[in-house]
Amino acid sequence: MVNWQVIGQLVSTGAIMLLGPAIIILLALKKGNL
């Protein structure tokens, strides 16, 4: 059996770790352009 809850937590954690810095960089670039 596959434990979807654990997989979901791992995927969400990985997504946050990847998207977090990307969002910060995008916000920094937008502020820099303004």
Curated annotation (Swiss-Prot):
GO terms for cellular component: chloroplast thylakoid membrane; photosystem II. It is found in: Plastid, Chloroplast thylakoid membrane. Keywords: Chloroplast, Membrane, Photosynthesis, Photosystem II, Plastid, Thylakoid, Transmembrane, Transmembrane helix. GO terms for biological process: photosynthesis. Its main location: plastid. The chain crosses the membrane at residues 6-26. InterPro entries: PSII_Ycf12_core-subunit. It is a single-pass membrane protein. The keyword Transmembrane applies. It comes from the Eukaryota. PSII is composed of 1 copy each of membrane proteins PsbA, PsbB, PsbC, PsbD, PsbE, PsbF, PsbH, PsbI, PsbJ, PsbK, PsbL, PsbM, PsbT, PsbX, PsbY, PsbZ, Psb30/Ycf12, peripheral proteins of the oxygen-evolving complex and a large number of cofactors. It forms dimeric complexes. A core subunit of photosystem II (PSII), probably helps stabilize the reaction center. NCBIfam families: PRK13686.1. Belongs to the Psb30/Ycf12 family. This is Photosystem II reaction center protein Psb30. It comes from Thalassiosira pseudonana (Marine diatom). The gene is psb30.
